[in-house]
Amino acid sequence: MNTGKKNFAGALVPLMFAFFAMGFVDMVGTATNYVKAYFALSDTMANFLPSMVFLWFFLLSVPTSLLMNRIGKKKTVLASLVVTVVAMVLPLVSYSYPVMLVSFCFLGIGNTLMQVSLNPLIGCVVNGDRLASTLTFGQFVKAIASFIAPILASWFAVKFGNWMLLYPIFGAVTVIAALYLGFSKIDEPAVEGKTSGFVDCIKMLGDPAVLLLFLGIVAHVGIDVGINTSAPKIIIERLGLPLSEAAIATSVYFLFRPLGCLTGSYILAKCKTWKFFAVSVLLMVLSMIGLFVGKSLMFIYVAIALVGYGNSNIFPMIFSKALLSRPDKDNEMSGLMIMGLIGGTVFPLLMGIASDALGSQIGSVAVISVGVIYLITLAFRFHKSEK
């Protein structure tokens, strides 16, 4: 038994390193605010940056799932880490708006490869009944990287006058993650039978249950990226704080993300998914109310904390349901679900348009609230399916 536990840990630890590297994508919110300030961009122009990241989830998720059928999950994860390193290096070569767009594109491509392949690779290490809690723990590790990014960026900006010192640090960590995983042994089951084509994968969205889960991912990521980018702007608008101080709002969000994931991995092992899903969505509803009416710093922080905790476990709960619904098509299902990360492109663009039109971040909060409303309907569906 000790040998089994050792082998399990030996396979899981490098995967958790990869989850940490996956969290670097959440630096887009912090980076967007600094780039916006430096180049004096409008909300709409600035929000093109996170859109360049999440556009690739829509374009490449299904092709990545097909690539996994050819080269395997582990090699796909390794390829994702290499692309992420390129994204970290580019801004160090030249700091301009076009280069940042290209860097964000590479970050999006790398993260697409990683999200599609890393989650099902976890399924090669753990069995079905532990999948949701293990994926949640992976999200906890990812959230640690998300949490420290804005803190480090603010500290580098104040201490050294250069927030971009974040890039070489994250680049080095990505290299370490790639080397660790590359030298680790993980057994992958062979793909049996005829593999699906691109059209076959897309047709799976014709299943109403699959479509509902896909749209749930769209809403979850839209909320996540939306809060990531808008939280500092809300504080700047209502309290007049400088960006270096307002950026801490993003850290508040990402502090409660790992707390939610850590407690969620335990709770999900003890209770029905729909109950925890419903509680999570309720916290987000309270958060939206707070973000609409909040005028004090502490009140806004509490609202951000609520959505951080509430949104932290939505992804693994939806994703595990999707994988377990079609275990024979886990690669294809993974690709479809990750394609839902297009919400990270759609929501910021709509938020930018709404906030520019209203001249207020109320527009951004309204767009985010649409995603929360959809998750309310999905919570009722979860309840019915688990009766």
Model-derived features: positions:
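Helix-breaking motifs and short loop linkers at transmembrane-helix boundaries and internal kinks
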Residues: 40, 72, 93-98, 240, ...
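Conserved MFS/SLC helix-loop-helix module at the cytosolic interface between two early adjacent transmembrane helices
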Residues: 59-98
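Structural signature of the two symmetry-related core transmembrane helices
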Residues: 76-89, 275-289
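Cytoplasmic helix-loop-helix junction between adjacent transmembrane helices
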Residues: 103-140
